[in-house]
Amino acid sequence: MAPATPKTSKTAHFENGSTSSQKKMKQSSLLSFFSKQVPSGTPSKKVQKPTPATLENTATDKITKNPQGGKTGKLFVDVDEDNDLTIAEETVSTVRSDIMHSQEPQSDTMLNSNTTEPKSTTTDEDLSSSQSRRNHKRRVNYAESDDDDSDTTFTAKRKKGKVVDSESDEDEYLPDKNDGDEDDDIADDKEDIKGELAEDSGDDDDLISLAETTSKKKFSYNTSHSSSPFTRNISRDNSKKKSRPNQAPSRSYNPSHSQPSATSKSSKFNKQNEERYQWLVDERDAQRRPKSDPEYDPRTLYIPSSAWNKFTPFEKQYWEIKSKMWDCIVFFKKGKFFELYEKDALLANALFDLKIAGGGRANMQLAGIPEMSFEYWAAQFIQMGYKVAKVDQRESMLAKEMREGSKGIVKRELQCILTSGTLTDGDMLHSDLATFCLAIREEPGNFYNETQLDSSTIVQKLNTKIFGAAFIDTATGELQMLEFEDDSECTKLDTLMSQVRPMEVVMERNNLSTLANKIVKFNSAPNAIFNEVKAGEEFYDCDKTYAEIISSEYFSTEEDWPEVLKSYYDTGKKVGFSAFGGLLYYLKWLKLDKNLISMKNIKEYDFVKSQHSMVLDGITLQNLEIFSNSFDGSDKGTLFKLFNRAITPMGKRMMKKWLMHPLLRKNDIESRLDSVDSLLQDITLREQLEITFSKLPDLERMLARIHSRTIKVKDFEKVITAFETIIELQDSLKNNDLKGDVSKYISSFPEGLVEAVKSWTNAFERQKAINENIIVPQRGFDIEFDKSMDRIQELEDELMEILMTYRKQFKCSNIQYKDSGKEIYTIEIPISATKNVPSNWVQMAANKTYKRYYSDEVRALARSMAEAKEIHKTLEEDLKNRLCQKFDAHYNTIWMPTIQAISNIDCLLAITRTSEYLGAPSCRPTIVDEVDSKTNTQLNGFLKFKSLRHPCFNLGATTAKDFIPNDIELGKEQPRLGLLTGANAAGKSTILRMACIAVIMAQMGCYVPCESAVLTPIDRIMTRLGANDNIMQGKSTFFVELAETKKILDMATNRSLLVVDELGRGGSSSDGFAIAESVLHHVATHIQSLGFFATHYGTLASSFKHHPQVRPLKMSILVDEATRNVTFLYKMLEGQSEGSFGMHVASMCGISKEIIDNAQIAADNLEHTSRLVKERDLAANNLNGEVVSVPGGLQSDFVRIAYGDGLKNTKLGSGEGVLNYDWNIKRNVLKSLFSIIDDLQS
């Protein structure tokens, strides 16, 4: 929802919430004030409405004496808010005349103006009925208002003097007729920034503002009844178009011109707009290419020189920026508002119903929002997939006048560009998980042209690709890069993209191959942004990247480069280094490069880590739904959702890394399991850690903002407090007998942590940082800062002395200073004491109780005070930057190592809570790593789970009744492969996924939801599940099946776990059966992995009934043949299923009986005919008439062993393509083959 802003109301709030007669009387008295008689000869002046700033309440303090006799710095006392204040000018004859001579008929709702009364009065009764006004700060904005505002708004228009009864449900922003005039940009800027000198703009609801001059232009605001987004149902039903889910209520931002007719005004504007911006009709890029051109660059816009010559300074300032980021939504700062022009304004209107201003600005269509709502509206555009550019004022109006006087326009420049993949502001980040922006580059396998390679290797490289990638989480500043060689199917790229799932991708135009491009887009996050940039000029090559790093001076010297950057450049990894260059260009364009690259948080990414962790490739991550489900792409029901119980944001991001790379080494797994056991038993330690971690903010992201100097002061204080909490934890754990990884992580805290944290304990006034969001250093810390503070105190003392003098002079102790908008330190004097006011004092405001003045000396001191505070504000910002720089000096040596340790401990707590949450039964897995004593090679793997449940079903269940458990045993005493058959929907796929999930949990160091678990460490899980085609990647169902199967055959080892579901069903029955039989034999005999093959080919089991490493399994069911009802028991038993029972499932789905009966007859005939043909062929091939079937796999193996390369994994060997084919595996091959022969003979 949009940030709600209190709306300025032209009427008082009444307790009953309705427009009572008292309210009308009050409004009448307000209007009659403007029509009172003025002595003749008084020069007439225009009636000015207050700026937004003058409509706010300013809390003030009473003047008190210092107990030590000195003067206190508090110069203000509270105002009596029962006084009703009204708006006026020094003279009002023009208004009186306009009202009396108006040619337009008056509305029935208009109030009569009493032109004979010299002064307007308001009764106490009126005031008593408007108590809800008290102590409310008033801010005018385009967009929001309170629900309790009156339904009717009365607006006095200039010249005509007509009071308009507004029935609009929108807020409107109405500048003066000259505001935004193309010939008066300077004044336009000045008026937008009025009120900057004071944070609040007045302490009364309706203030008598007597202007000194008539030349200044003011904005008039027309606010009408409109609910705040926080308090109104966004999807309310009205006559307008239906709101979108995130759509804010209708708003308008309408510059007003004092034309006689709104229709003629709008028509005139539209005509001028069309004439001046005719070149926007046929959009072209900066090189004048039309949209139809393949090389069209949507980021730029061509503006003809004739248009440039007609632009005002303000227009030039805007279009200079907008033309270079035509694909961005540009928020342009104007005073206390951000404005959208032309295409951006129209888009805002179409998407979010932000109203288009009727009169525009400088002939540009516009919509506007208050500056305080920028983050909300920027986030709305970003969620819709747009980029947002923020153009801010680099100086205040006062600073501009101090710099060059009244000439010129306020400096503005592009502050930042916000995109969904590169957000750094904590308020705009809605997830604790990392969001990545990735740059990718592709080159052919022979890119490096290595002449020393033999011809066969060169031919192989022609079928490979080289990829370079670099990706960054801009919120933390962590940048990772890599270069890798991939196969023709881009297997590794698929894995990388599945792990990273970037929100934004930068790629060189026409660089990626068709397949790589499809993989990148298919595996990126939903609504990801894809940026195609120019080769060389924007996506830097290796040499250009090096030159940019040197010229931009991210690092002091070349020796100061991060190790991975230095290594890539020195070793000639040009593709990876160029990928970093592509990312560097994009960060420069976003104006993030200085802050992020200089952090030196650059590492090499290893997406496999095969030596230290289990490998989960991209297909497996998708098939097992590790991070996102296949239903809606969220994490509901995923394994990550089960494990994501970390307390700190850093811990949640670390947990994702842990889950991508489960442990592989037995000692590492056991150590983590010991830690989990320790935390499960030591409740006190757990509570201590959890309480401490719950107090920690997102330190990793805050450190990045400290480095970029964008952190808020109060957040900087939070960082120091958080590290103080950490050293308290460290101190309290000194005497604890910590076990496992907890002890390892606690001891990894840097030695200088305590000293570094204590040096910041008293660096500045902490409480002021929390309460006032300012840094006040200890006296003597900064000389310039001390001088500035002394100057402000000196001015306050002088003002205090003058005030005390005035009190004595007027013999009135109630004289005080008041701030009202940009007029600060105005002298407020009770009416009873104003008769002695000197004639040279200038009256600034008045009500029935007080009048406010400026004397010459106070006006001068007030101006000096404003300038002093402006200078002090700059010093405060500079001081914060220097403090951030000092803190950031220990980023890599102290702060980040500490955060890493905390994140790891938090992950241990998360695994502990997951283990506790599994319910009963659950157990600690037993890890067994068997090695051949003679050859020191790993023996074949095995696993055994008793009464295993799927952990993502019925989370937190306390009994096993909620899910039907199953025993799973592969390897060791049982065959390594299970050939699983059964009816459709009987639970085969669930069994397959459940086995894989259990293995991952065990190697994560977590308890497993079963009665007992014993397994060897599994090096890789590979899956072939489902029968979906892949339109995004241009692959058919059968192609997807075979491509995934090839990866299994290439990468699997005797310690891998394979899951293959219904291989071959994408092709014809004969082709599919042949492929399934061949693959199963090769895996069972030569690769010797653990795994399951689920199939509906009933005869496949008979082909392997003699194979010692294939075990037939089935899912049990109960069948009622009469009604064709099937009861699924979800229990896995040994044996072969009687069939797939497809007709029964069809009946359960409601297909008509006639169709099912016909299908059953056809199926019976087909099965009978197929069996007769097979038996006849077998009999014809047997001389003795006996039907003996020799498996095709056995025949092939003997041919290769006898006539090929024998027991080798060469092209003609029996184990062709097998990754690991050592002597133990070869011995098992021979055992299997001879076992099959023995069974055939028997």
From Swiss-Prot:
InterPro entries: DNA_mismatch_repair_MutS-lik_N, DNA_mismatch_repair_MutS/MSH, DNA_mismatch_repair_MutS_C, DNA_mismatch_repair_MutS_clamp, DNA_mismatch_repair_MutS_core, DNA_mismatch_repair_MutS_N, DNA_mismatch_repair_MutS_sf, DNA_mmatch_repair_MutS_con_dom. Changing residue 337 to S: In MSH6-6; partially functional in a mismatch repair assay. One of its GO terms (cellular component) is cytoplasm. Residues 1-11, 54-69, 103-121, 220-233, 245-270 have a biased composition (Polar residues). Keywords: ATP-binding, DNA damage, DNA repair, DNA-binding, Nucleotide-binding, Nucleus, Phosphoprotein. Changing residue 313 to A: Fully functional in a mismatch repair assay. GO terms for biological process: interstrand cross-link repair; meiotic mismatch repair; mismatch repair; replication fork arrest. Residues 18-37 have a biased composition (Low complexity). Changing residue 848 to A: Fully functional in a mismatch repair assay. Residues 166-190, 198-207 have a biased composition (Acidic residues). PANTHER family: DNA MISMATCH REPAIR PROTEIN MSH6, DNA MISMATCH REPAIR PROTEIN MUTS FAMILY MEMBER. Component of the post-replicative DNA mismatch repair system (MMR). Heterodimerizes with MSH2 to form MutS alpha, which binds to DNA mismatches thereby initiating DNA repair. MSH6 provides substrate-binding and substrate specificity to the complex. When bound, MutS alpha bends the DNA helix and shields approximately 20 base pairs. Acts mainly to repair base-base and single insertion-deletion mismatches that occur during replication, but can also repair longer insertion-deletion loops (IDLs), although with decreasing efficiency as the size of the extrahelical loop increases. This is DNA mismatch repair protein MSH6. It comes from Saccharomyces cerevisiae (strain ATCC 204508 / S288c) (Baker's yeast).
